[in-house]
Amino acid sequence: MEFPDHSRHLLQCLSEQRHQGFLCDCTVLVGDAQFRAHRAVLASCSMYFHLFYKDQLDKRDIVHLNSDIVTAPAFALLLEFMYEGKLQFKDLPIEDVLAAASYLHMYDIVKVCKKKLKEKATTEADSTKKEEDASSCSDKVESLSDGSSHIAGDLPSDEDEGEDEKLNILPSKRDLAAEPGNMWMRLPSDSAGIPQAGGEAEPHATAAGKTVASPCSSTESLSQRSVTSVRDSADVDCVLDLSVKSSLSGVENLNSSYFSSQDVLRSNLVQVKVEKEASCDESDVGTNDYDMEHSTVKESVSTNNRVQYEPAHLAPLREDSVLRELDREDKASDDEMMTPESERVQVEGGMESSLLPYVSNILSPAGQIFMCPLCNKVFPSPHILQIHLSTHFREQDGIRSKPAADVNVPTCSLCGKTFSCMYTLKRHERTHSGEKPYTCTQCGKSFQYSHNLSRHAVVHTREKPHACKWCERRFTQSGDLYRHIRKFHCELVNSLSVKSEALSLPTVRDWTLEDSSQELWK
């Protein structure tokens, strides 16, 4: 018959006996603090106490712990854990508990403390990263919204035209995701409208009998749509997208006139580029009128905004593409189309880095550039971009590794040096003050650290715990033993190591030790 609560009841009784001082057979001293406890409990929970009591059980009533490593509050917490099975850190630093548990060889507590320190560091790093991301997102959204409203107000508009007569050029993000094949749209070149490729009519084209809306009104409607799209994609702006964008299949096989939409830098306005192929059926319809509208849109949008909102690192690309475009317009006929490479450079040069995931997938892979989303620098390959991004992350990790100003870090008041916990600070302060709190009761000699006092105490007890393996001579200090071995047994040790390496037998070392010791006694 088992009693499941027996162990809990036993611990409770032992804890009450400890608080009452009943049957406590040892005293643990940590600095000036004294703790009464039971040897059996201490030896069961700590390997340090187990080894301490193993050899001389009757002569170890008082146990001195190194107060430079184990603090009194930390040992009190560990003593409560031994008797109650509960670990409550309260306001005690985790570093002090970790140092005390390591000193007492309480490995379960060491694991818990290391885990808590790791979680604490991860939490601080995540909170710092969220604050930086939130501030960067808000700054980008404000700058984009201000730029969009400013340019939209400067563009000419036709207020007399109705909303139903304006060309809705850009499809929504939902339409782009649902119908990737309709990413390129046709623009009607006459008042009656032209049937679209594949037998589908354009949903936003004007009906028969109505005139096409002017480029100014079309551009105005596009600017209004761009402002709302930037506000909707504020969260997407913070995402780090390093994937290589691929072009849509079938762009090269378009057999009808088309245009491509492009967001102008930061303002997210659309610059309409219209080209027509050399088709005999469509080459004679409204050519002169349409070319005039096309040139008006191009001059009003590109020349006014290209210089004002162009980043410094994209200026060479932009100027180069503009020169090539002007030469192409002077030499090319009406039936020529823009090459995919120049179109990609133009679109990516005028595109905000956060909008590249939405637009660059419709461009050809030739002549790709890779932009850093943090500093907007351009790189020729994704591998170089990854190397560049690692420098940003190293800088951020270095900033996060610095302790915050509001955190209570143990700091020396004299030299300003910081420490991980209080016991190392107290140990360091003795180097400034010259304090020697540990005094020998036999001769009155003082020491700065407790381990020096323990080593000195052996002189008065005349114990010789350090024995030589070769001649059985014993010494008080370990240093005396090492000097003795170097002086008398150095050649013997070297010869033994050479023999053991040459023979490589598992028992050759023990055999040689016995033989040599017999030779020494002759």
From Swiss-Prot:
A GO molecular-function annotation: zinc ion binding
List every position bearing Phosphoserine. Answer: S157, S516, S517
Q: What is its main location?
A: nucleus
Annotated stretches, region: Interaction with DNMT3A: 310-427
Question: Which first-to-last residue range defines the signal peptide?
Answer: none
Zinc fingers (C2H2-type): give the ranges. 370-392, 410-432, 438-460, 466-489
Q: Which key words are in the record?
A: Developmental protein, DNA-binding, Intellectual disability, Isopeptide bond, Metal-binding, Nucleus, Phosphoprotein, Repeat, Repressor, Transcription, Transcription regulation, Ubl conjugation, Zinc, Zinc-finger
The cross-link described as Glycyl lysine isopeptide (Lys-Gly) (interchain with G-Cter in SUMO2) comes at K273
An example of a Gene Ontology BP annotation on this entry? skeletal muscle tissue development
- Pfam (any one): BTB
Under the heading PROSITE patterns, the entry gives: BTB, ZINC_FINGER_C2H2_1, ZINC_FINGER_C2H2_2
Q: Which cysteines are joined by disulfide bonds?
A: none
- Enumerate composition-biased segments (Basic and acidic residues): 121-143
Protein's job:
Transcriptional repressor that plays a role in various developmental processes such as myogenesis and brain development. Plays a key role in myogenesis by directly repressing the expression of ID2 and ID3, 2 inhibitors of skeletal myogenesis. Also involved in controlling cell division of progenitor cells and regulating the survival of postmitotic cortical neurons. Specifically binds the consensus DNA sequence 5'-[AC]ACATCTG[GT][AC]-3' which contains the E box core, and acts by recruiting chromatin remodeling multiprotein complexes.
Please give the subunit comment from the record: Interacts with DNMT3A.
> What does the similarity note say?
Belongs to the krueppel C2H2-type zinc-finger protein family. ZBTB18 subfamily.
Its recorded name reads Zinc finger and BTB domain-containing protein 18
> Which species does this protein come from?
Homo sapiens
Q: Name the gene that codes for it.
A: ZBTB18
